[in-house]
C-alpha cells in the first residue's frame, strides 16, 4: 500500500504558477479539513495525483485562497469538498459559493472510517483528513451541499432560542429548589416550583419572614398573578407555612439571591411563552407542519422541519427515520451480538423531542 506525505505549505509560500500548470484542463477537487483557525486543503486531479497540500489561516487568508483558486487554478472544473463541521466551515462555504465554486459535503463518519484505507496508517490529522476528503469525493462519497432556505434558518434560530431559555429555566429552577429546601422547605411541598404565583411572591419579597411581614399584600399578589386559577386555600396554606417554617432564616444577601433567581425565572418564562406563540403562528401558517403537529405537537413539528427539512424531500419513510438517528443497527459478533440499538446519528434535538412525543402518547 502506497504511503503518502502530508506536509503542507501556506498559501503565501505556495508555487501557484506550478499549481496552475499541474491543474490545467483537469477536473480538480480541493478537499478541505475545517478547523477553528488553521484550515488544510489538498488539490487532487482526476488521476488522484495531489497537485498541492495547502494550509491557511481562517478568516484572515480565506479571501486570498478564493482569489488564488479563481485566478491561478486553470482547471476545466474546480470543486470543493469539505466536512460539515458544526458552523466552522460555513463562512468558507459562503465565500466560495459566491465565487461560483460548487461545494460538496463529506460525512465526518466516512472520513473517520477511512483513516486506514488509503495509506494503511490508522491515524488522522489535518492534512491527512483533507486528503481523505478529496479522495472520498473522487470515489463518489460526497453530496452537493445545498444552501439552507432562509425560512428554515429562521426556524432553526427560533428553536435554538427556545432551547437556550429552557436550559436557563431548568438550571435556575434547580438552584431555587436547593435554596428553598434550606430556607423554606414547606413551599415546594405546597406548590410547584415553577408556578408563576410562587415566583412572583418570591421576586417581590424574597424569603418567608418578609412574606409573613407583608402577608396581606402577598395574598393579593398571589391571587392576582394566579389569574383565578389558584385557590384561596392554597394561598392560605403557603402563607401559613411561611409563618411557621422550619427553614434557616435568610441573611440579607440570601434574600436578595432568592429574589434575583425568581425574577430571572419569571423573565425566562415570559420569553418561552413569546417563542411558543411564534411557533404556534409558524405551524398555523404551514399546511405540512399543521399535519405533523397533529401527531407530534407543534414544537416538535417545527423542530423536525428545522433540523431535517421537509419529510417530502426524503425518498421513503425509512430515509426520514435514518436522518433522525432512530434506525436500528445490529451487532453481528462480540458481547452485544444480536442486540438492536438505535444509531443516534443526526441532530440530537430531534430525538429529544421525539422522546417527548412518545411520552405524550404513553401518558
Positions of PLM-derived features:
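A detector of single, family-specific signature residues
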Residues: 1-363
Amino acid at each position: 500500500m502506497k504511503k503518502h506525505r502530508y506536509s503542507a505549505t501556506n498559501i503565501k509560500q505556495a508555487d501557484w504558477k506550478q499549481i496552475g500548470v499541474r491543474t490545467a484542463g483537469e477536473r480538480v477537487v480541493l478537499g478541505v479539513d475545517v478547523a477553528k483557525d488553521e484550515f488544510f486543503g489538498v488539490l487532487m486531479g482526476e488521476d488522484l495525483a495531489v497537485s498541492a497540500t495547502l494550509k491557511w489561516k481562517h478568516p484572515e487568508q480565506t479571501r486570498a485562497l478564493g482569489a488564488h483558486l479563481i485566478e491561478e487554478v486553470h482547471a476545466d472544473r474546480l470543486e470543493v469538498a469539505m466536512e460539515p463541521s458544526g458552523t466552522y466551515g460555513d463562512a468558507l462555504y459562503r465565500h466560495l459559493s459566491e465565487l461560483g465554486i460548487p461545494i460538496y459535503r463529506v460525512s465526518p463518519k466516512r472520513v473517520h472510517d477511512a483513516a486506514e484505507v488509503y495509506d494503511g496508517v490508522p491515524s488522522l490529522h489535518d492534512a491527512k483528513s483533507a486528503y481523505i476528503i478529496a479522495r472520498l469525493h473522487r470515489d463518489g462519497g460526497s453530496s452537493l451541499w445545498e444552501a439552507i432556505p432562509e425560512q428554515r434558518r429562521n426556524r432553526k434560530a427560533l428553536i435554538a432560542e427556545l432551547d437556550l431559555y429552557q436550559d436557563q429555566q431548568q438550571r435556575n429552577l434547580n438552584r431555587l429548589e436547593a435554596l428553598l429546601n434550606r430556607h423554606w422547605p414547606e413551599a415546594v411541598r405546597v406548590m410547584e416550583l415553577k408556578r408563576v404565583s410562587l415566583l412572583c411572591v418570591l421576586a417581590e419579597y424574597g424569603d418567608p419572614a418578609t412574606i409573613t411581614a407583608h402577608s396581606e399584600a402577598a395574598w393579593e399578589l398571589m391571587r392576582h398573578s394566579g389569574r383565578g386559577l389558584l385557590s384561596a386555600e392554597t394561598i392560605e396554606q403557603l402563607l401559613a407555612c411561611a409563618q411557621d417554617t422550619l427553614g434557616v432564616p435568610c441573611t440579607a444577601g440570601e434574600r436578595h439571591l432568592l429574589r434575583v433567581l425568581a425574577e430571572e425565572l419569571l423573565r425566562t418564562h415570559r420569553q418561552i411563552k413569546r417563542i411558543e406563540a411564534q411557533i404556534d403562528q409558524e405551524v398555523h401558517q404551514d399546511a405540512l407542519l399543521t399535519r405533523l403537529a397533529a401527531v407530534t405537537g407543534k414544537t416538535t413539528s417545527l423542530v423536525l422541519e428545522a433540523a431535517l427539512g421537509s419529510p417530502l424531500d426524503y425518498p421513503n419513510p425509512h430515509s426520514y427515520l435514518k436522518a433522525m438517528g432512530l434506525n436500528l443497527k445490529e451487532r453481528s459478533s462480540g458481547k452485544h451480538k444480536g442486540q438492536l440499538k438505535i444509531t443516534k446519528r443526526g441532530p440530537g434535538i430531534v430525538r429529544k423531542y421525539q422522546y417527548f412525543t412518545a411520552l405524550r402518547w404513553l401518558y
